[in-house]
Swiss-Prot record:
Residues 1174-1358 form the DH domain. The keyword Magnesium does not apply. Residues 299-309 have a biased composition (Acidic residues). Residues 512-522, 812-828, 838-856 have a biased composition (Pro residues). It is found in: Cytoplasm; Nucleus; Cell projection, Podosome. Guanine nucleotide exchange factor which activates Rho GTPases. Strongly activates RHOA. Also strongly activates RHOB, weakly activates RHOC and RHOG and shows no effect on RHOD, RHOV, RHOQ or RAC1. Involved in regulation of cell shape and actin cytoskeletal organization. Plays a role in actin organization by generating a loss of actin stress fibers and the formation of membrane ruffles and filopodia. Required for SRC-induced podosome formation. Involved in positive regulation of immature dendritic cell migration. Residues 217-237, 901-920 have a biased composition (Low complexity). It comes from Homo sapiens (Human). The modification Asymmetric dimethylarginine is found at R866. This is Rho guanine nucleotide exchange factor 5. The PH domain binds to phosphoinositides and is essential for podosome formation.
Amino acid sequence: MEAEEAQRGASPPISAIEEFSIIPEAPMRSSQVSALGLEAQEDEDPSYKWREEHRLSATQQSELRDVCDYAIETMPSFPKEGSADVEPNQESLVAEACDTPEHWEAVPQSLAGRQARTLAPPELWACPIQSEHLDMAPFSSDLGSEEEEVEFWPGLTSLTLGSGQAEEEEETSSDNSGQTRYYSPCEEHPAETNQNEGSESGTIRQGEELPPEELQESQGLLHPQEVQVLEEQGQQEAGFRGEGTLREDVCADGLLGEEQMIEQVNDEKGEQKQKQEQVQDVMLGRQGERMGLTGEPEGLNDGEWEQEDMERKAQGQGGPEQGEERKRELQVPEENRADSQDEKSQTFLGKSEEVTGKQEDHGIKEKGVPVSGQEAKEPESWDGGRLGAVGRARSREEENEHHGPSMPALIAPEDSPHCDLFPGASYLMTQIPGTQTESRAEELSPAALSPSLEPIRCSHQPISLLGSFLTEESPDKEIDQNSQQEESRLRKGTVSSQGTEVVFASASVTPPRTPDSAPPSPAEAYPITPASVSARPPVAFPRRETSCAARAPETASAPLSMDDPSPCGTSEMCPAALYGFPSTGTSPPRPPANSTGTVQHLRSDSFPGSHRTEQTPDLVGMLLSYSHSELPQRPPKPAIYSSVTPRRDRRSGRDYSTVSASPTALSTLKQDSQESISNLERPSSPPSIQPWVSPHNPAFATESPAYGSSPSFVSMEDVRIHEPLPPPPPQRRDTHPSVVETDGHARVVVPTLKQHSHPPPLALGSGLHAPHKGPLPQASDPAVARQHRPLPSTPDSSHHAQATPRWRYNKPLPPTPDLPQPHLPPISAPGSSRIYRPLPPLPIIDPPTEPPPLPPKSRGRSRSTRGGHMNSGGHAKTRPACQDWTVPLPASAGRTSWPPATARSTESFTSTSRSKSEVSPGMAFSNMTNFLCPSSPTTPWTPELQGPTSKDEAGVSEHPEAPAREPLRRTTPQQGASGPGRSPVGQARQPEKPSHLHLEKASSWPHRRDSGRPPGDSSGQAVAPSEGANKHKGWSRQGLRRPSILPEGSSDSRGPAVEKHPGPSDTVVFREKKPKEVMGGFSRRCSKLINSSQLLYQEYSDVVLNKEIQSQQRLESLSETPGPSSPRQPRKALVSSESYLQRLSMASSGSLWQEIPVVRNSTVLLSMTHEDQKLQEVKFELIVSEASYLRSLNIAVDHFQLSTSLRATLSNQEHQWLFSRLQDVRDVSATFLSDLEENFENNIFSFQVCDVVLNHAPDFRRVYLPYVTNQTYQERTFQSLMNSNSNFREVLEKLESDPVCQRLSLKSFLILPFQRITRLKLLLQNILKRTQPGSSEEAEATKAHHALEQLIRDCNNNVQSMRRTEELIYLSQKIEFECKIFPLISQSRWLVKSGELTALEFSASPGLRRKLNTRPVHLHLFNDCLLLSRPREGSRFLVFDHAPFSSIRGEKCEMKLHGPHKNLFRLFLRQNTQGAQAEFLFRTETQSEKLRWISALAMPREELDLLECYNSPQVQCLRAYKPRENDELALEKADVVMVTQQSSDGWLEGVRLSDGERGWFPVQQVEFISNPEVRAQNLKEAHRVKTAKLQLVEQQA
């Protein structure tokens, strides 16, 4: 930053400024106008004259270019001394002009006379580029056109003037602050720039700018205060830009103003310049308004957006505050202007709409800039004034709507100038930034169309637009804006599908420049750069426009106008930009314009060498047509242009292309483009001019590959729309490999001629600075323009840019470049982009064959390649459904992401291959899908979620995609490489792919907004999930396959994860799979399901059971009817304690087998009966629950048992008792799950689990039996340690507080094995109930169920045996016999019930009245005898009588006694110790106690016939109950119990249907099932299991 600031401080020589002014933007524009059939034609001659003058100065500036290039490389502002000197003058002039309208008028005149207003000095150009290649130096537009435009829209000119003044004030403020800003020169004042250049080139004058303000003021469009406010805002914006933060507002305002001024310089130095200044003012005002609007979509709140911009720009310098103020000031005037201009633009809306209709015909509708205004006046608005007015109005509206950078405002001013030269071009410019500012582009375009904005030609707007796009704060907004802008562009005729493409077209239209002539400024080289709209205005680019072009890529978001402002350095950078080298990760900001525009530049003017051809009339026409409906008519093929950009750049560029559609991407592109510009400036100063060889959007599309998404957009619309005109003699500029920094890494980009070998027939008003070398064909007619549009020529070896983009792409891409790559993917790959260069203009309908790589999570499944149809730039062209671009990379954060190479994943190649690997249509279900179609472990499912893979990750997690895309854009430009870049690509491509919803998506992916996104998302927002997911992103796209594929192996245990990001995977409800949650040491197989859910088994089972309970409750009021195809309803109806599987499936909808994308999208379900579907769901639930169980075991073993700190607090015996054989249990479970998953993968539609359970039954017995048997010691040891070992307590507390435990205690982990084996039996029982009677599957299920049932019985017996033995030993120590003694301890004896009762005795009295006496008696009921004892001190008992169980009987007592004596029952001993009969009367405290004793004393009952118990009440357990006495029944949630008796005090006795166990339990734990049909169904299922078991026993016997 310091170096950049220093450079900013050093203003480049005025000669450089002159060089900019020399750039014949006006002639170009005039030619453009002529192509449009507007008055611009009349200006062609003056423009040519001016061009030659500019060439003369360019010759001088050539030296300055070197200096500028150097400055640009260092990213310093290029305020040249002359410009610096001029700045004060300009400031003074502006101040005067602002002070009084008279002074403004006088000044404009004087300035016009002397052409004091010069093109934005190189410093301006450099500054915009440096600050964030926010804007491309505006191209000077033909004065004549501007004059005409001014005449059409004096209000616009006044607005422009106001903007210029605001910029002047901004410049002054920036100068006062002593901060040199890239935009300071540009934004400080277009007037200041004009003065500098006016002194040298005499092309632009402040006076000119002032009159427009005056006009505006007089017309009510702009008030003096507003003008001042605009100026201040412009200054502030300039400050922000100077700070090096790519402020969209500042860049847009300052750069646009300056660019417009430059354009005016290029145009007539006199009145035209004044008009341009006016237009610029209007533009600036609009820009400010737009910026304000961007800040608040409809509130015109510049404050928020400005604050964000300030924060972003604050990174560079203190300019942000000024920028914000200026934005705020501009808002009001701009709003007023917007109102007035909107009215004007409305007049043109009809024409624009016409054009839009045309564009829509070509599929450009999606991204067409609202050209309603333009279409209405397509012929007339081509003058540029109308376009500017309409563009402004719309851009403001769009800004307000999108909260995005004030791209529309920028675009509007720029569009006006462009409209002067090339209303379409400027319009395109507007649209380009419009990936973010598409809606703005729409606004601007109409504005540009309606008012004669030729004065607006000054490429101020590009900067502003770029800045606005670049602003980080509006990534989300930008995305929306991008889509809207793209749409508006389509309407306008720009390649709306890819706003960048439109920009490219306009840029490509820039007239070919001679090597001497300054290379098309970034705007020219990259008119489509996010600086975008300003990119065209930078007609005054220095001869070194190549450097600008180079920058343009970097400043992708910052239109070339930023690059253009610095004739020397920027011009050099232009080639890089043109080449689509958003080489630096910073390029993301420019995606809107830069992505496509840059690529085309690379192929057109950007390409060095003779191939750089002047933009042919076709290009101009194309640009114009782009601006109008014609442009969108032919969707350029992103593939064609994507090849132009180096791979690395392409990756970023592509992303940027898409980014162009998204403001966030633009901002990211800006940053990247800045870096790339700094590197590219030097090597590609002359060559970069050539990238504009194809002025068409195709050219831009060619360059858009730099952005990644732009290729797709441009290729879709621009390429098709623009047919390469016969290349005029290509003027090969010195081809210098452009060095672009991608992700902060400098990359050498070899400037190459654009794919369109034809020299740009004419420089679009915005992007053409170099003198037009050949007659610029006039393409007023959209069809004509299209015809004139040069088709991208087949990639020539000379196209270094193309090779370079690949080279860069191949180079280790910084995280930032990754983002752009997704755009390139729409083609086939970065390489394929080269192949597509020569694509002839095709109907927009056809999108690139290969969809761009989907953004990570953010994008969500819409990005997946499966869908196959991506509409790049909103084009309907279908991409191969098989494309790999459907990469569901955005996986949940926990998922493993693509290998670090993933940073390049955004690259078209990487994304393509990844998408292919990831995208298996069947992999939608994260876990199960993975099973079906496991992807290579190297294919991370969560590239997006896993930020580590690249910086883009931040953008994604942001996210996100997430709306991943917006988050990606928000991420730094570097992040944009993978995140933003992808998101742009995802936007462009997803729309295409969205044609079919990704199979990956599972119903459990609520977060996946991208999944199955319709092709209509072509606006580039397809990424918005998102993206994301992944983010997105829930299981977003992580399918079953993915978890299994994850290298971590255990991280993704199940399907949902696969789709979680963008890919398919959410079949299982489980949430994101965590890579580390793999089965601890088990390496045999990477579990696909183990980490599919974030829930541990404890929580998972609770959730499932709770849902089961809820479904049962709902069924109470419903009759059991076969539900629809959905298995849930049937389950609900069949809910029973045994149907754990049903409950589990119902509990987690995401874990449903039917939700696996492969299953859901297949026809198998149609041929399956409802019962068969339920059976599969039950079996699948067994697998899913086992994965969750294993995850919990891994924590128990790895986190607790293997903890060294915990082990230090325990003795060996304590450690053995506490953990027993837990590790063995874990290993068996891991093997079991592995076999289950393998079985499932072998046949997902009819997989088996019972045979696997049966095969593992011996292993279960080997580990579960000893572990469960040790449970008693385990509990005691744990309790003892907690009570006596403080160290253990402290360490355990610390371990349990770890997030991995999810607030669960160690005890809950230790009891899991027994719980699991019990529930596993219940799951098998549910499977058995749904099998066909007599089938082999029923036999296997019965065997497996019986084996587990026997295991559980043995476990229970072992546990009880130990406990009973201990209890007998304890009692033997407490009991004494006063009667016959007998041995109490016996292995066959256990205590059934014990308690103290009150014995009632009647004593005989002399009066024959019996007296009732009471005494306490303690009963100990064993399974074989009963002891009666008297309690003693010390909990001791004295036995006075006992009897065998067979000789005792209890019964209710019907005796009515007076007093409190209730709850009585009789005990009869037929034979006591003495061999006599005895009778006792006992009283209990409660009725339940009485009933429980009577029940315990009763003889064992025969087993009930369940089919005869239909009238018996049933209850379902709501809360688990742990028995406190031996006669109580342990309950688990969802258990169904048939009630046999109940007491008045809230206790029930019943038989559990699942296993026939009997016992008592409190009524508070259960809920009665009132529906008789449900009760009958529960009984029927229980009977079915019982019958099958009996048959098996008989067979075995």
